């Protein structure tokens, strides 16, 4: 058996983000003045209070496996933050802590999508979305937006894209990469509501 990687992985397209980052590095190494817009790397150092908290955790032997959905104290703090800053009320059992957005999105898609299900992606979208859907054996279906609509889709576009195979709509606000913000999702979500 010579094949190590699965066909599923081998058939994924290469990451556009990693390809752009490699090209930017190459040009920078050639002495060109490059502003890298590919990877979302912070342009600031980790704040001291976070570094100190990490050191304190290590010194206190706070180093065992965490609960799968996150520490209760952290989930309670997240609930408090949502209430204080956003006026949203959640219970700790409604919060899942993960290593980042990509993991959370991949987990959600894996548990929601069956082979052959359609997932609607509002384009432009984060480059990982289509690969995440393909890994779940779903079909990524693009709904295009443009500068004239501030890179937002309309309810009629969404309604036209929905078919009996549609299982999920992936829409993020603020959008990555366009930055557009849906101030209200009520009007855009109307086509997804069950008819009475």
Segments and roles (model prediction):
Residues 29, 59, 113-114, 163, ...:
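Short conserved AdoMet
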Residues 173-176:
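Flexible low-complexity scaffold tracts in large eukaryotic assembly proteins
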Residues 45, 105, 129, 178-179:
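Glycine/Thr-rich phosphate-binding loops of Rossmann-like dinucleotide-binding domains
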Residues 186-196:
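Single conserved hydrophobic/aromatic residue that forms the stacking wall/gate
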Residues 2-100, 107:
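N-terminal small-domain helix-loop-helix segment of the aminotransferase-like
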Residues 16, 46, 150, 178-182:
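Secondary-structure boundary/capping motif
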Residues 100-106, 123-124, 179:
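Short N-terminal helix/helix-N-cap motif within the alpha/beta-hydrolase-1
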């Amino acid at each position: 058996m010579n094949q190590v990687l699965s066909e599923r992985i081998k058939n994924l397209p290469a990451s556009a983000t990693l390809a752009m980052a490699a090209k930017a590095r190459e040009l920078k190494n050639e002495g060109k003045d490059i502003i890298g817009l590919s990877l979302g790397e912070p342009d600031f150092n980790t704040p001291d209070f976070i570094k100190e908290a990490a050191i304190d955790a290590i010194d206190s032997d706070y180093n065992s496996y965490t609960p799968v959905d996150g520490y209760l104290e952290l989930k309670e703090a997240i609930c408090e933050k949502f209430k204080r800053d956003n006026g949203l009320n959640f219970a700790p059992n409604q919060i899942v802590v993960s290593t980042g957005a990509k993991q959370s999105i991949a987990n959600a898609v894996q548990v929601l999508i069956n082979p052959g299900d359609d997932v609607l992606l509002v384009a432009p979208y984060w480059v990982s979305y289509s690969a995440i859907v393909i890994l779940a054996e779903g079909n990524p279906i693009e709904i295009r937006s443009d500068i004239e609509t501030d890179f937002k889709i309309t309810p009629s576009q969404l309604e036209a894209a929905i078919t009996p195979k549609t299982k999920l709509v992936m829409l993020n606000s603020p959008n990555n990469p366009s930055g557009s913000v849906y101030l209200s999702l009520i009007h855009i979500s109307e086509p997804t509501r069950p008819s009475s």
